[in-house]
């Protein structure tokens, strides 16, 4: 039987990184999204063959489509056991003082990114 695989968005730091670590320690292969090659290399060195980095931004549909094509090809005839939509940002401070563009960016990443 092949190793169980999951996909987690936003694994560079924080909750995503902790989730990546948890699943690798429990015998899973994790496909994880990062936004740059530096993070991809750093995490690949740590998690080796248990981790496949996917470089994309959840707000960029073309990048997402490329990642999906790669995943389908890499998984061959198996499926992902789970998808963890973790990628997100938090803009600190009262909503009253946020710029509209910053609020829209937060919604685009946290809400629309999970939908895409």
Where are these regions (language model features)?
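Substrate-binding pocket helix/loop in short-chain dehydrogenase/reductase
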Residues: 94-95, 102-105
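Conserved NAD(P)H cofactor-binding loop of Rossmann-fold oxidoreductase domains
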Residues: 86-91
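Conserved glycine-rich cofactor-binding loop
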Residues: 12-14
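Conserved hydrophobic beta-strands of the Rossmann-like cofactor-binding core
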Residues: 5-8, 80-84
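Aromatic pocket-lining residues of Rossmann-like dinucleotide-binding sites
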Residues: 23
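The beta1-alpha1 cofactor-binding region of Rossmann-like NAD(H)/NADP(H)-dependent oxidoreductases
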Residues: 56-67, 100
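Conserved glycine-rich Rossmann-like NAD(P)H-binding loop of the short-chain dehydrogenase/reductase
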Residues: 26-42
């Amino acid at each position: 039987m092949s190793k169980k695989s999951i996909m987690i968005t936003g694994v560079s730091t924080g909750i995503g990184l902790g989730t990546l670590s948890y699943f690798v320690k429990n015998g899973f292969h994790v496909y994880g999204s990062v936004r740059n090659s530096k993070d991809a290399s750093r995490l690949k060195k740590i998690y080796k063959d248990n981790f496949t980095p996917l470089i994309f931004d959840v707000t960029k549909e073309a990048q997402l489509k490329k990642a999906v094509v790669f995943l389908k090809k890499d998984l061959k005839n198996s499926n992902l056991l789970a998808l963890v939509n973790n990628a997100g940002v938090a803009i600190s401070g009262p909503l009253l003082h946020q710029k509209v563009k910053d609020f829209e960016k937060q919604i685009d990443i946290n809400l629309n990114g999970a939908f895409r």
